[in-house]
Amino acid sequence: MSRQQIGVVGMAVMGRNLALNIESKNYSVSIFNRTRSVTEEVFNQNKKKNIVPYFSIKDFIDSLLKPRCILLMVQSGKATDETIKMILPYLEKEDILIDAGNTFYKDTIRRNEKLSKYEINFIGMGVSGGELGALNGPSIMPGGQKEAYKLVLPMLEKISAKFKGEPCVSYIGPNGAGHYVKMVHNGIEYGDMQLISESYFLLKYLLNMSNEELSSTFSKWNKGELNSYLIEITKNIFIEKDEKGKYLIDRILDVAEDKGTGKWISKSALDLREPLSLITESVFARYLSSLKRQRIIASKILQGPKIKTFIKDKNSFIEEVRRALYLGKIISYAQGFSQLKRASEKYHWNLKYGEIAKIFRAGCIIRANFLQKITDEYTQNKNVVNLLLTPYFSKIANEYENSLRNIVMYAIKYGISTPTFSAAISYYDSYRALYLPANLIQAQRDYFGSHTYQRTDQTGYFHTNWSQ
């Protein structure tokens, strides 16, 4: 009996497309799905391809060359644990199990530890690019046993996205490192999307720009510093029309949903004591948008500015928004990469930040030209503390901070919500501040809780019996 080179479990759209991607690179693929009809459907649609369906987990695993390589693309959480439990009795030492789902990194750490006891290699692999990326080439973030990674690297390089011929895949680190980086990627994606949405609202409601004008503006932006996948699709979204010839964007309900993964990075930030303010505000912005009924009521009760909109120079304002958006994006990445550094230190992952930026350059949702700037900065200095302190990004920050400040002032003046722009300038001012009002907070803590404080003129910790 001929055996296949790799098996894929989970035939929803992502698993299906990854299987097809792998097969297209001259690999033979076994497929399995708990629901028999789904497996049959995938096979029947691809009979001419080197894909072999199996309907029992034992037959599926027996069909694979040793050491077996099995890729899981199932729902994260309980479903992944149940699938591993189902597969485990049939696995042998040195087999490789790859979890390519959108998995919480602590689950990956736990599973890696458990499977290591059986001498089974477990790779937690972040995959970005959506269903089309899975089919045509995603950005891939594998973490786990390095020796196992080396065995699957030839396949991963072939199926990954390419940036100027360079595969967008690199070994991230041990156990949960790959899924942690994917989590940070998702958080940056949240931040990017919210910043772009706030830019759209400022242009639409302060300049009364039409959808055609918005599309044209974003098209120009996409030819410069802001060149990215998200800017590219946004310019297309503005001019998409429905079956009645109406602009679709104007008929989409203003409620942004999420799959719950956005909050993971914010929870981790709190655990690590990392000020991930912009990205966390982008998560909260989605939650606030979901309060649609309450917002309708509030719009009739709570007052805002009643002054008439007046922007003297339209082109100058558009440029201010562009600059604010670029600096906001930089601050978002600065926060995300700062958190990666803190997590790497805590979990002893030894992350390579320049390599991480490189694999984001193609295939993934946050792909953008400016990622090369991040790679360049880490190439010149492997001990970057914060991207805002590097030569290129500090230069941009100093040139663009006034635009970011002006945009937030305009938003406040005219009552337009800009949570991530506001978080960006607040973080920027706090981060560059020689002094913050935290001395008063520490005095208050000592006053009511005897928590002590440090002094600027003496070493050690002090407590005062404050006057009542």
From Swiss-Prot:
Pathway the protein contributes to: Carbohydrate degradation; pentose phosphate pathway; D-ribulose 5-phosphate from D-glucose 6-phosphate (oxidative stage): step 3/3
Positions with a binding annotation for NADP(+): 10-15, 33-35, 74-76, 102
Keywords: Gluconate utilization, NADP, Oxidoreductase, Pentose shunt
Pfam families: 6PGD, NAD_binding_2
E.C. numbers: 1.1.1.44
Catalytic residues as annotated in Swiss-Prot or TrEMBL: 182 (proton acceptor), 189 (proton donor)
Entry binding sites for substrate: 102, 128-130, 185-186, 190, 259, 286, 445, 451
Reactions catalysed: 6-phospho-D-gluconate + NADP(+) = D-ribulose 5-phosphate + CO2 + NADPH
Assembly with partners or alone: Homodimer.
Name used for this protein in its record: 6-phosphogluconate dehydrogenase, decarboxylating
Organism: Buchnera aphidicola subsp. Acyrthosiphon pisum (strain APS) (Acyrthosiphon pisum symbiotic bacterium)
Taxonomic path: Bacteria, Pseudomonadati, Pseudomonadota, Gammaproteobacteria, Enterobacterales
Annotated gene: gnd
